Structure formats: C-alpha cells, structure tokens
C-alpha cells in the first residue's frame, strides 16, 4: 500500500513475453502510484505500444530505446513518454544537459528509415521462427518460452554445460540459470541468417 512506483518490462527480459494489455490497463488504473512500462523490445512484439494510453492515465510513463530494433546500443539513447505534468517534474530533477548533438543527429537520421527498420525486424522475426523450429528438435532442450522479443529463452538439461560448450565454439549466449525461476535457462539472441546457420550447426554438434 506504500509503494510509490512500479516498473514493468513488456516484452519482458529475459522471458520475452508481453503482458496482456487489458491486465496492464487495469493495473495502471488501480495503482495509486506511478507505473513505468519499459518497452525496449516493443518493435519485435505483435502487441502495440501503450503510448496511446498516456492521455488516459495520469500515472503512466513509457520508456523505449534505440538499442534494440534500431541496433544503436552504442549511442546509449533512451526515450521517456508521459503527460505534461510528470515530464515537468522530471525536468526539475534531471541533469541540466540533454543528449549531445552527434547522438541527436544520428537518432533523427535513423528515425527516417522506417521501411528499412521494419524490414530488419521482419527478418529477425522470420529467423526467430526458424530457430524455434530447430530448437524444438534438440534432445537437450526441455522448454522454449513464448517470445515477443528478438531473443528466445530456452530451458535445457544443463545450462552451465551448454553455455560453456557454445562459448568454446565462439558463440556467446546468456546463461540465466541463477535468475529466479530461470534454472537451467539460456537466453539466445536471434542473429542474422548466416549467424543462425552457424548456431544451428554448432548446436547439432553438442
């Protein structure tokens, strides 16, 4: 009852699943504090962004990034969206300097490439489905979690073993076995067609 702010990640990391929009709407409506929804992976999701709900709920903040679908993690650019009242409070406490001009120009340049970004996202989603189909056939894969992101969370027989086997082959995945409810889970980022071919070939050899 004393909670002032609630952070949610949808699509979630590391599971990749999205929260149901109706459930989120009810939560935002009933929660007395601020609700921040991190939509870093929203471009890969079949579910729409909740940005349109900002005008409906006074306690909603949406955050997004150019690190994922836009492939620009190096410029470290994130965005926050909310109503005028909340933004005015944030402006009072944030550092005095905004993003540098090089970052700003690069971001504006990339935002014009709508069709190219959509094409890249569709390619990743297509490769994700192919990768899932392959993973389902592996004996050491016990479960594949539904994903709305550009990665797949996979439960295997022994996450530490499989992680190290892949690492020795020059392939880095995320070992999430020490995270709560993720025992023996690996998070695999979906690569390009050629990268996935290498991954599939390597997994076949384990």
PLM feature spans:
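Active-site phosphate-binding strand-loop segment of PLP-dependent enzymes
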Residues: 1-45
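Short beta-strand-to-loop capping motifs
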Residues: 82, 154-157, 190-192
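Short, conserved active-site loop motifs that form the nucleotide-linked donor/cofactor pocket
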Residues: 3, 33, 59-60, 141, ...
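Catalytic-core regions built around general acid/base machinery
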Residues: 22-30, 52-56, 89
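Conserved PLP-binding catalytic core of the aspartate aminotransferase-like
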Residues: 124-125, 137-169
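PLP-dependent enzyme catalytic core of the Aspartate aminotransferase-like
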Residues: 22, 168-169, 179-206
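PLP-dependent aminotransferase class I/II
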Residues: 59-137, 144
């Amino acid at each position: 009852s004393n909670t002032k702010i609630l952070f949610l990640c949808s699509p979630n990391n590391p599971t990749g699943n999205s929260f149901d929009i109706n459930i989120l709407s009810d939560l935002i409506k009933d929660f007395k504090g601020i609700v921040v929804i991190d939509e870093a992976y929203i471009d890969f999701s079949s579910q729409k962004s909740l940005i349109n709900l900002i005008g409906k709920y006074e306690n909603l903040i949406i955050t997004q990034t150019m690190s994922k679908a836009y492939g620009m993690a190096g410029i470290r650019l994130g965005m926050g969206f909310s109503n005028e009242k909340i933004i005015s409070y944030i402006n009072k406490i944030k550092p005095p300097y905004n993003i540098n001009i090089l970052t700003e120009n690069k971001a504006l340049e990339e935002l014009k490439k709508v069709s190219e970004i959509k094409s890249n996202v569709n390619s990743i989603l297509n490769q994700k489905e192919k990768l899932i189909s392959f993973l389902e056939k592996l004996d050491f894969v016990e479960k594949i979690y539904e994903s709305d992101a550009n990665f797949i969370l996979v439960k295997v027989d022994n996450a530490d073993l499989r992680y190290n086997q892949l690492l020795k082959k020059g392939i880095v995945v995320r070992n999430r076995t020490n995270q709560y409810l993720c025992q023996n889970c690996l998070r695999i980022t979906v690569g390009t067609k050629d990268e996935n071919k290498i991954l599939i070939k390597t997994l076949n050899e384990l």
